[in-house]
Regions:
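OB-fold and OB-like single-stranded nucleic-acid-recognition modules
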Residues: 2-22, 26-218
Length: 218
């Protein structure tokens, strides 16, 4: 274990551009957003799916354990405090003796590239290595192409876009979210395409762009 040191930056998660969002400011606004974004067929949408991954998945993320609690895989933001604060799904098979880590005040943590399986609730580790020095890579998502802009920018005002963003973030259990290129973006733990389909049905096509924090190992 490395000697105690204070983190000098926000511990990254390897997810470019994701900004933490609070819950919707008030129930009235959330209710209004729901009324404006009914499912396409007019029926009440079911709860969003929580798919399991069919094979191995990977991510660059902070792993953190507080006192006697289980190790957690922090796929969202990490608070720049000392010790840092974050939360996420439980990670099983983790061995702090097998990796370098920092510790303070009953908390132990580090940033790693992890690989394992995801059953929809728990991440089961198969391999962990040190995080890359610069984990950020340019995204090749076609929805970022200006020629492929989404419908939000032309259909909704700025306040309506923010309202939709808040609702989507809460509805999908987002880890991070923002608006860009005519889409409301939201990062979830894992999506096999079913969460994107749910979002399209509930909010309309070309409005919500779902990104998966856990990526399938190719």
């Amino acid at each position: 274990m490395k000697p105690l040191r204070a983190p000098g930056r926000l511990l990254g998660t390897g997810l470019a551009g994701a900004l933490l969002l609070g819950l919707c400011a008030c129930a009235e606004a959330a209710g209004s957003a729901s009324a404006d974004h009914e499912p396409k067929d007019g029926s009440m949408a079911t709860a969003p799916p929580a798919p399991a991954a069919p094979g191995l998945v990977t991510a660059v993320a902070t792993v953190l354990q507080e006192n006697d609690g289980p190790p957690e895989l922090c796929l969202g933001g990490v608070a720049e405090s000392f010790p840092p604060q974050c939360g996420g799904p439980e990670i099983t098979g983790w061995d702090w003796n097998a990796v370098e880590a920092d510790s303070a005040q009953g908390t132990i943590w580090g940033e790693y590239t992890v690989e394992g399986t995801w059953d929809g609730e728990t991440f089961r580790l198969t391999e962990a290595t040190s995080a890359p020095t610069d984990p950020t890579a340019p995204s090749d998502d076609p929805r970022l192409d200006p020629d492929n802009a989404g419908a939000v920018g032309r259909d909704l005002s700025e306040s309506e876009t923010q309202e939709l963003q808040d609702e989507v973030f809460t509805d999908l259990g987002g880890l991070g979210g923002w608006s860009e290129n005519g889409y409301v973006w939201v990062t979830v733990v894992y999506d096999d395409g079913s969460i994107q389909s749910y979002a399209d049905d509930r909010y309309g096509a070309d409005r919500v762009a779902v990104q998966s924090a856990l990526r399938d190992v190719e």
